[in-house]
Amino acid sequence: MKLAGLKSIENAHEDSVWAATWVPATEDRPALLLTGSLDETVKLWRPDELDLVRTNTGHSLGVAALAAHPSGIIAASSSIDSFVRVFDVDTNATIAVLEAPPSEVWGMQFEPKGTILAVAGGSSASVKLWDTASWRLISTLSIPRPDAPKPSDKTSSKKFVLSVAWSPNGKRLACGSMDGTICVFDVDRSKLLHQLEGHNMPVRSLVFSPVDPRVLFSGSDDGHVNMHDAEGKTLLGSMSGHTSWVLSVDASPDGGAIATGSSDRTVRLWDLKMRAAIQTMSNHNDQVWSVAFRPPGGTGVRAGRLASVSDDKSVSLYDYS
C-alpha cells in the first residue's frame, strides 16, 4: 500500500482549511470532495483534477466540520457561528439550519444508514443526535463530569467534546474530549458503556474500522494514534511517528490502513498489520487539519483516493493503492 500525489491546489480557500469529507457517488455523478474553511465557505471539488464545482456560502464565521449523508444527496457544515447548515449537494438549497449555543458545534457524522446526525457538543460535554427526517433533536448523550467540582476546578471544562464517530453498524457512538478520554455509547439505549483511556491530551479525531465494528482509532495532541477495542475497553496498541499533534485520522475503505494529518505539517500512511507508519507525505507547509479517504462505489471509479487540507489554504489529492 502506498500514496502518490495526484494534484494540489494552492490557495484553494482564502483562509485556513479545517475540514474535508467526501460526498458519496450517486447515480448521476461521481463522488465529490467537500472542503470547509475559516473563510466561511464550503467548496465542492471534482476529482481527479480538483476542478471547483461550486462555492457555498451561508455561515457568518469559519467552517469547523463537515459531514456527508450516505445517500450522497445532502451534506452538513458546522461553523463557529454555532449553526449547522444542512444543504442539498447538487443545488446548495438549504434543507435545515440547526442552532446550538456558542462553542457547541465541533465534530459531526451521519449515522451509517443516514437516519441520525451526531454533533459533538463542545462545552456542554455531550453529543446531540438530530433526526434527519424531521431535523428535530431526539437525544442528548451526556458525558459524566467529575463529582462536585470546586469553582476553581478546571476539570469540567476539560470534558469539552471535540470529535465523534459512528461504528459501521450504527450501534455504537464514540466521542473524544479535551481531557484525552473517549466515551463509547450504546445509541439504542442512550447509555454510556465505558470510557477508553490511553491519551492524556485532547482527542481531536476518531474513526471506526470499516471492517471491524469493535476497532476504534483515535488521534490526539499527545502525538499518538491509538487502536482500541471499543467493546472490550482494551487498548490494542499505540502508534507514534508524528512530531506534534495528530489532528485527523481516517481509515481506508479496505480496512488495511489509516491516514493521519498532523500539526507537524505531514500526512502519514500507517500499515495496520505492521502497526507502523510506512509513508510520509509533505505536500503542506502548515498544519494538516483533515484527511479523508474516498468511500468505495460509483461508476468508473479508479483506484483509491485520499484528500488532505491545511492551514496553508491548500487542498491535496493522493492516489491510494
From Swiss-Prot:
Phenotype seen when the gene is deleted: Early flowering, reduced plant size and defects in floral morphology in whorls 1-3, but fully fertile flowers. Growth defects due to extra shoot apical meristem (SAM) formation.
Any Pfam family hit: WD40
InterPro entries xref list: G-protein_beta_WD-40_rep (IPR020472), SKI8 (IPR051510), WD40/YVTN_repeat-like_dom_sf (IPR015943), WD40_repeat_CS (IPR019775), WD40_repeat_dom_sf (IPR036322), WD40_rpt (IPR001680)
WD repeat start-end pairs: 12-55, 58-97, 100-140, 156-195, 198-238, 241-280, 283-319
The UniProt record lists the keyword tRNA processing: no
GO biological process entries: flower development; negative regulation of flower development; positive regulation of wax biosynthetic process; post-transcriptional gene silencing
Keywords: Cytoplasm, Flowering, Nucleus, Repeat, Transcription, Transcription regulation, WD repeat
GO cellular component, one term: Cdc73/Paf1 complex
Origin superkingdom: Eukaryota
Function: Component of the PAF1 complex (PAF1C) which is involved in histone modifications such as methylation on histone H3 'Lys-4' (H3K4me3). Involved in regulation of flowering time. Required for the expression of the flowering repressor and MADS box gene FLC. Required for histone H3 trimethylation on 'Lys-4' (H3K4me3) and histone dimethylation on 'Lys-36' (H3K36me2) at the FLC locus. Prevents trimethylation on 'Lys-27' (H3K27me3) at the same locus. Not required for meiotic recombination or progression.
Assembly: Component of the nuclear PAF1 complex (PAF1C), which consists of VIP2/ELF7/PAF1, VIP3/SKI8/WDR61, VIP4/LEO1, VIP5/RTF1, VIP6/ELF8/CTR9 and CDC73. Component of the cytoplasmic SKI complex, which consists of SKI2, SKI3 and VIP3/SKI8. Interacts with VIP4 and VIP6.
Name of this protein: WD repeat-containing protein VIP3
Organism annotation: Arabidopsis thaliana (Mouse-ear cress)
